[in-house]
Amino acid sequence: MPRYHPISVLPEIDCVQSDLRELRWTDDAVVADFIIPGDEHHALRVLFTNQVIIRILDEMPLNTESESTPKEGLVPHHFAYRVEEATFETTQSQTWKFTQHPATHYRFVTGWTCLDVLSAKEPTFQVVKRRPISTFD
């Protein structure tokens, strides 16, 4: 049974009104910027500085994902969680999880785009100025 453990993040974000604004993956970090509802000038940055496995999906398939039992610990409109025994975590490479032990599953929920991250390090959170999203020629 998936167990959700809410993570306290400041500023508190109403996940229903937020969305993933930008995701960048470099050789040494994964950076995810989320919309802070009501603040057009800043974003909430979630940063992982180690090897990770990620999954990005819409909120609808996440809610309809086949789990054996109800989800324990979900808080209405909450944004960030540490999750145990969810399908995303249990179906990943055992070798990767062994070499990255202890790997923890983090889930960031918005009203549109959700982000799952499997990581051996905790994420850091910071409020940053919004910048124009890069485009490619």
Report each predicted region and the residues it spans:
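Surface-exposed, interaction-prone regions used to assemble/regulate multi-protein complexes
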Residues: 1-137
